[in-house]
Amino acid sequence: MLVNHFISWKINYYLSTKPYQLTGLSFLLFPLTFNAQEAEKDSISATIQTVEIIGRRSQDYVSDYSFAATKIAMKNKDLPLTLNTVTKELINDRQAFRLGDVLKNVAGVSNASFYNQYSIRGISQNEEGQIINGMRTRQYYFLQPMTSHIERVEVFKGPASITMSSVDPGGTINMVTKKPLLNDRYEVSLSGGSFDSYRLITDLTGPLNKSKTLLYRFNGAHQDGKSFRNNVNNNGFLIVPSLSFIPNEKTSLNVEMIYNEMNGNLDRGQPIFGATARKTDLNSTPISLNLGAPGDFFKTKDLTLMGSFAHHFNEHISFNASYMKQFWDEDTHETRTTNSFVPDISNNPVPSLAMMQYLERVQHWEVDNINAYFNFSYKTGTFEHQTLLGYDSHIWEKKNGGKQDAARGFLMKDGTVTASYNPANSALYQTMMYNGITIPKPNVNPFDLTSGALNHQGNDYSVLNIINPLPTALTTTHAVYVQHLLTWKKFRLLAGIRQEWFQDRTNYKKPEESAFRNQKLLYRVGLTYSVSESTNIYGTYLTGYQPQSNTTSLMPGTSGFTGGISASLYKPLISDLKELGVKTKLFAKIDASFSVYEINQKNILINANNPAEPDQLIQRGADRSRGFETELTGYILPQWHIYAGYSYIDAKVVDDSNPALVGLAKENTSKNSVNLWTRYNFSAIPALKYFGIGAGILYQSKKIPWFTRSFELPAYTTLDLALYYAVPKTKLQLALNVNNMTDTSYWVGAQNYLRLFPGAPRNYLFTATYKL
């Protein structure tokens, strides 16, 4: 039977003959049209949990709660901050197999490159790794993670520093994995499409015993794909088993494993030919041009083990704990530019000849996360209280055996290699001729960008002149925090403080070990007022902190930072957020949010853009980002879904050692962006009842690159379309997704003339899914 109703957050949960009422969680399903039995089970599974143990059965674009934002599963409407959620249903409808494809649905979030690297509200991410189920993993960001095991992706805007460690000022991306369901469900899908891309995905779940106290879920995926870019592959497989044990109405446990192997290439972007200031032709080279060699590779193995435990002592007191252990290994061979052109004998750049380097890197990391907290619910008179007392730790060890060797620079006549060219000593350098021009001979063969030029793309270097064992390191963060939610009439006051202690030990367990320590007290306060049942207004203030030592390596070109001999060269990144907003429900069907904000950050770490030292870093004084966001999620009609957003970002440099930069726009930031996805099912039309259609639009206004202000990346609009068909009298569903239908040429980001990141041309993906 189909129903349309509200489900209260106070419900009875039966695991035996005894009903047990949990009153410590705020959870409400918005009025939607779906199966009543599924609705009941959804509310049950959400209500028993204070950490996520049981999965979500409802199948729509709306997820109105979050565990990670406050650790008390507040309704999103009551949160005094902006939280955007992309559910697995939207992920599946768009066939968004990579995280970057998921995040283009979120207002104010944009790709800065091909990597797992994003700008949120005009502020680029600094931290390496991913956050999974509220805990931080560590891995290089060059390949985007698969999403087949993801229940939803949450984006917390601003520094979510009270409940998470060392978060980025612009926002935090949290990936929530799929958990076991109470009923059997089996799903297998096979996809194939452009660029010789093939994917196989399986999702199996259900109970393992009659009493349904032991549940399982298994997600697996295999990807074999090329790219529109030359010499680029992205292959891998993913195995994610999960078990949930619920022996009684008070206790629950989940254990989970994620094993991910990826074998691809580091794609450093498209170089352009003959580029000069204000005379830059972005189409001077094909968007497929990649300077990497066919023999290059980027191989990683990532094993993550997780456990979550929750126990309710009574209806007022509960305890929650989570643990994560991660092992990560990397083996990389890479041919790339030095972000510069080869000079001639007079030291003038030759803008058709890219200076190259070759790197070999091996690394082994281990990560431990612990998160534990007590939750107390009580009343004093007319006031309702929910107090959280917690501790967490994050330990990241870089193991022995790591290295980053390189070949770059110029060859000298005595057989040595020097990092840079000095025209005053030109007689000491080996030379060669290029199109009638005398140039100092590079250690690694340069790449000729001239159309039709013959380039032998291989590991062509004379001397592996940089032998760099990566030092062992141990980075630890310990924190205690207190959070209090006070509810009185129509007001909710959410306040919290966090004391964090940080230590970075370089050359860990070696005689030359050195240590750097830092600490910070962080706080936040947010007030929500319920204007009506459907409308809340809020204001919030948050502070953030990142210790910029060996932990930071995500900024462009900072690959050598993880091998730095000092942990204390740079001041910590300090940030804060001020935000006002409105959250409401329009026409009882569409969740809408509107917010204005200001984010300030100080001591920003950026690349020095020094070709002789490509990994050199400097610090900028301060940036400021102000903006406005609005988002709509829900149903226009019962069969018509919508997910849309608009973002305006005014991000500027407010303090820099170069006075000419003060007041200028921040790099890689679009002022205006629009995202829209909508799906319509023809269920009300008998002749078309098995069909559905989808359409999406993404608009980004112009932006400037990271390392040069001499050219702009133009604004662009892309159109995506989808067609869905449920084969009658079978469990088979078919989907055809066409991305960039108009075959628009565009660039998502850039660093300089030699590293632009073009968007994919028109491409398609056909998917067949069988469900039981």
Question: Model-derived features: where do they sit?
Answer:
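Outer-membrane beta-barrel translocator/receptor signature
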Residues: 149-151, 162-239, 247-251, 303
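Short acidic/polar hinge/loop motifs at secondary-structure boundaries
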Residues: 107, 135-159, 175-178
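Structural signature of Gram-negative outer-membrane beta-barrels, strongest in the C-terminal barrel
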Residues: 246-248, 365, 384-396, 401-403, ...
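Membrane-embedded beta-barrel scaffold of Gram-negative outer-membrane proteins
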Residues: 312, 318-324, 328-334, 571-635, ...
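Extracytoplasmic beta-strand/coil segments of soluble accessory domains associated
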Residues: 61-63, 67-75, 80-83, 100-136, ...
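Acidic/polar loop-and-plug regions of large Gram-negative outer-membrane beta-barrel proteins
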Residues: 223, 227, 240, 244-312, ...
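Conserved C-terminal beta-signal and adjacent last beta-strands/turns
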Residues: 359, 363, 375, 386-387, ...
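Gram-negative outer-membrane beta-barrel transporters
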Residues: 598-600, 619-706, 769-771
